[in-house]
Amino acid sequence: MTYLRLIAIGSAVAFLIGTISLHFLQPGYDPVNQLMSELALGPYGIIMLFAFIALASSISTLAFVIWRLCGNITLHVVLLIGAACFAGAGILPIDVFNGAHIILVFCAFVMCGLGMYLLPGCLNSSSKAHDRMISWGLGGMLVFTVIVGQVSLPGGIAQRLEAAILLMWVVVFAWRTTR
C-alpha cells in the first residue's frame, strides 16, 4: 500500500505544481478575485486539465486505500464521485461549459466534504478520536471557508483556501491510513 500513498500524495503535489506554475505563466491573471478554473483560459491552460486530473487521481487513490482498509463502499463511492467531478471539471473548461463546470466543481467539493464527515467512522485505528478531530476539523474549515467566501472573502482567495484544506485532508489521510 506504500505505492498508493505515494500516488495519492504525489498527485496532490502535481496539482499544486500545476496550479502554482500557472499563476506565474498566465498573463493578467488575478489570483485574489479570479477562480482557479480561470487558469485554464490562457495560452498554457492545458496545464489546468492535468491539474484537475491530478486532483482527481489523488482523491480516487485515497478512496481506493480507504476501501481496501475498511471496505466502506459508501465512502468509497462518495469519494469516487468527487474525483470524477473534478476530472469532469478539467475536461469541461469554464470558458466553454461554464454552467456544467461550476456544477461539477460544486459537486466535487460537496462529495469530498461528505467524505471528510464519513471517514472517521470507518477507520479502525487506535487513534479514532484523533482521526475524527482531523477529518471533521478540516471539513468544518472547508464549510466555513465556503460560507465566508460567499459573504466577505474574495472568491479567488476562498477557493484557494478550500483547495488547500482538501489537499491537506488527502495528504494527511493518505499518510495515516497506509502506515
Locations of regions flagged by a protein language model:
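Interfacial helix-loop-helix junctions of multi-pass membrane proteins
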Residues: P27-Q34, I91-I103, V151-A164
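Membrane-interface helix-boundary motifs at transmembrane edges
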Residues: T2, F64-L75, G121-M133, R179
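Terminal transmembrane helical module of multi-pass membrane proteins
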Residues: S127-R179
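Alpha-helical transmembrane segments of multi-pass membrane proteins
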Residues: V13-Y29
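Small-polar-interrupted transmembrane alpha-helices in polytopic inner-membrane proteins
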Residues: T74-G90, W136-F144
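Interfacial helix-start motif at the membrane-water boundary
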Residues: E38-S57
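Membrane-proximal helix-loop-helix units in multi-pass membrane proteins
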Residues: A84-L123
